Regions:
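Nucleotidyltransferase catalytic core that binds NTPs
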Residues: 1-107
Length: 107
């Protein structure tokens, strides 16, 4: 088991497959950082893979709404709060990721 792991996703809207992904990652580390991509409009750029991915219509929920959904789901799955954290993950601006996520983690 590794000490610290980081995963990321948009989580627009959080669903069971997202939870399978999150819980599978949590099983592999003591502390998991769950990164929310496209946390705000300043850190969102057009995706070369899917031009609709960064559209406002494809991102109806705010960072805070997604944060609350993830925390609520983690409580429902009985994951202790001390074993995870939910963070912004500005995937479109990779130079800022380490402002939010630990450098020494496994990504």
């Amino acid at each position: 088991m590794i000490e610290t792991g980081v995963i990321h996703g948009r989580f627009q809207v959080l669903h069971l497959k997202h939870m399978e992904y999150i819980l599978a990652a949590k099983m592999r580390c003591r502390k998991l950082y769950i990164g929310i991509t496209n946390p705000d409009s300043m850190h969102t750029r057009d995706s070369v893979n899917d031009i609709n991915r960064s559209a406002k219509s494809a991102n109806p929920l705010t960072y805070f709404e997604r944060y609350e959904m993830i925390r609520g789901a983690m409580q429902e799955f009985r994951v202790p709060e001390s074993e995870y954290d939910v963070i912004p993950f500005p995937i479109s601006c990779p130079e800022y990721i380490l402002q939010y996520a630990p450098k020494e983690a496994v990504y």
